[in-house]
């Protein structure tokens, strides 16, 4: 189980220094949260493909769209995902192995109705040692199947607490089962075949696992102190996009939206929010977004949902397209977060089509209201259009409604914060300010060369100023950075405050700031 930060970057941050060039095309990490068939609960698991997902979390199921979202993500250009499984009162399967007058009780390590476990016991090569036995634990693809998905073998396990292979210690290493209660006094009875030469029989679960109930907002949000739900992502070094696919026929509540957008704001990430199921037409979507109280520049939404081509009956209302959107954005990021994908590269793939057709006038109206749209541009081609965030009409600064500005800003802040951590272990403290300014100046200059920043000259597109300072708050140095995301000399300005006592960097937006630090 993951307990240390899940580092999905290619370089150990301890090797960073002032000569390290800040990359312009980092890997985009997308997090998915929701119910799955099986897998570890409230643990961030890095996934590199849909086959990998299936091995850890199982396949498609009727109570969740998470598996579809992950599949769509990789199909549309995504490369790195993190999946956090959450559940509401899911139960664990129980296995009871006779052991003389007692019982060895085992339960599934993870809850769920798809944990089809079985065990066998034999005494091969330990017949003369009455406290020892061999235990085989298997997970099957389905009940009574001979297809084994996972298997664990514990050889020479002992019932003696002083033994090196004491059963309690041995089962602590299992990823499939765990011991329930104290072990029996006698070793488990061997599961012998009825006739010589027949396969050794297995014992199935006496109490099956359960998938639990529908998720509540609080299952999704989880606990900050316990590191569950959304907060399990704190163990990830990097999160760029967050998807919480809505369950079949049911919307997640406003509490989930508020918590997720606040979390994304803290992590400089973006929430891909699925549209309500009540958006059954372009007109309903327009009415819905205009009367909705949900707004955040750290989120985007879209319309319509998608479905497999020709499969109208099974998915009449469609399925969430958050995985599609995340995959397209991750693909765009490989060219730079500020780029827009050409139409042919932002199209639906994998035999997916819009659940509802949206014509050009409705698509334009939706985009003006803050909703991106899947639009049929030619026969057989549907593209993702809009480039708008969910900042809403109440946002005073109009540039935050542009998805490109939101993502560029997050990318710049996150990159500077990560790649300037060398400041806390600088080997040349007397040159720290110069080295810091140079590193960030080069990064922003390269962005301007790529047309990510406005202006034809550096002073029109950005500025960098660093000032050493020591005050009661423990700030050792402040770096002020301004960059023009839309128009020359109109800067978004931020202070990076490097705090030595905690070795953390505080990022503060500075409205109407001077280029120099006072």
State the predicted function of each range.
Residues 1-34, 58-76, 101-225, 258, ...:
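Small/polar, repeat-rich beta-turn/loop motifs that tile beta-strand-dominated architectures
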């Amino acid at each position: 189980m993951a307990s240390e930060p899940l580092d999905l970057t290619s370089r150990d941050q301890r090797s960073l220094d002032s000569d390290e060039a800040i990359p312009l095309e980092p890997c985009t990490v997308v997090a998915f949260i929701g119910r799955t068939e099986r897998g570890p609960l409230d643990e961030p698991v890095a996934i590199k493909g849909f086959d990998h997902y299936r091995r850890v979390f199982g396949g498609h199921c009727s109570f969740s769209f998470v598996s579809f979202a992950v599949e769509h993500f990789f199909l549309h250009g995504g490369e790195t995902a993190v999946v956090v499984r959450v559940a509401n009162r899911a139960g664990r399967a129980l296995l009871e192995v006779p052991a003389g007058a007692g019982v060895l009780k085992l339960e599934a390590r993870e809850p769920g109705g798809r944990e089809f476990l079985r065990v066998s016991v034999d005494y091969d090569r330990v017949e003369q040692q009455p406290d020892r036995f061999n235990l085989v634990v298997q997970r099957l693809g389905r009940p009574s199947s001979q297809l084994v998905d996972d298997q664990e073998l514990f050889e020479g396990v002992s019932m003696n607490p002083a033994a090196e292979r004491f059963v309690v210690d041995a089962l602590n290493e299992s990823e499939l089962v765990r011991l329930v209660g104290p072990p029996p006094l006698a070793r488990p009875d061997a599961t012998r075949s009825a006739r010589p030469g027949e396969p050794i029989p297995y014992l199935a679960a006496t109490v099956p696992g359960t998938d639990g109930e529908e998720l509540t907002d609080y299952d999704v949000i989880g606990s900050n102190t316990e590191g569950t739900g959304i907060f399990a992502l704190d163990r990830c070094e990097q999160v760029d996009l967050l998807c919480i696919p809505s369950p079949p026929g049911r919307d997640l509540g406003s509490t989930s939206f508020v918590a997720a957008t606040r979390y994304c704001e803290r992590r400089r990430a973006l929430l891909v929010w699925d549209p309500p199921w009540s958006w059954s037409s372009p007109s309903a979507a327009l009415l819905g977004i205009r009367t909705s109280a949900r707004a955040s520049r750290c989120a985007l939404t879209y319309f319509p949902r998608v479905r497999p081509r020709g499969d109208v009956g099974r998915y009449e209302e469609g399925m969430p397209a958050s995985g599609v959107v995340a995959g397209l954005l991750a693909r765009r990021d490989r060219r730079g977060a500020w780029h827009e994908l050409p139409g042919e590269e932002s199209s639906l793939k994998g035999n997916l089509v819009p659940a509802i057709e949206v014509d050009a006038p409705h698509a334009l109206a939706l985009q003006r209201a803050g909703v991106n749209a899947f639009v049929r541009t030619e026969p057989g081609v549907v593209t993702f259009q809009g480039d708008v965030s969910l900042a809403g009409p109440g946002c005073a600064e109009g540039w935050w409604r542009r998805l490109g500005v939101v993502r560029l800003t997050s990318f710049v802040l996150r990159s500077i914060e990560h790649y300037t951590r060398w400041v806390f272990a600088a080997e040349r403290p007397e040159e720290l300010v110069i080295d810091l300014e140079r590193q960030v100046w080069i990064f922003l200059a390269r962005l301007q060369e790529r047309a990510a920043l406005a202006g034809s000259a550096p002073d029109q597109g950005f500025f960098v100023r660093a000032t050493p300072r020591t005050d009661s708050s423990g700030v050792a140095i402040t770096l002020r950075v301004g960059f023009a995301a839309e128009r020359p000399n109109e800067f978004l300005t931020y202070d990076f405050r490097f705090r030595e006592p905690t070795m953390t960097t505080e990022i503060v937006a500075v409205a109407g700031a001077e280029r120099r630090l006072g």
